Amino acid sequence: MVIQFDISRILNARPVSTLNNNHLTGWTKGIDGGGLGDGYLTLSAALFNGDKQPHSLPDDPLFATNNSHPEIKLHYSNTDSLNYQTCNLSGEDSLKFAVPQQKYNAVYLALTSSEGASQLHIVLTYKNNVVIKDITLPDYYADLSPADKNLSYLAHDLAKWGNKNNMTEKDHHNIDLLKIEADAGKILKSITIKKDKAGYLVFWAAAGEKG
């Protein structure tokens, strides 16, 4: 069983342009360039924009289960032209969110790092102890190793668009999904993501997998 964690309180950015009633709402804080460089478009937004066979995000933000991960739901929607979609971090920074207090086999974090890799410190806070896991998240242009069972593509080979919704690169960008093994015998309370100075981090979604 998979639980989609509610991270709405920490969202602070809108990197995906959406289309609602033939109105294109552009992204406002993007995925690179410190939030000023580029963003993504939904498929409907890209087609409305005149892009041919665009490597865009799907209109449905629910990514289906596959061999690498369970269902993961992102926070963009073509029916929502107002609310934030991600939590973006630049420089040395951190974020924290509570989870439903249960026992989990694993947690999944949807992330992108641009401007190079990001060194992350994932803090799992249980009722009785704390576990820290150090992770190097590669740049979102990097190809992932199929042998790495803890890092997979959530969205693969994406184009990116400038601040006027003009396509700047046609493919090769990813949203990665990090799997963190949890202690299935302990109740998890919260997750903290701490980031070192290098890289620009976009946090898209989180979910927990119960036994």
Show the residue positions of the predicted features.
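N-terminal/edge-of-domain interface segments
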Residues: 1-211
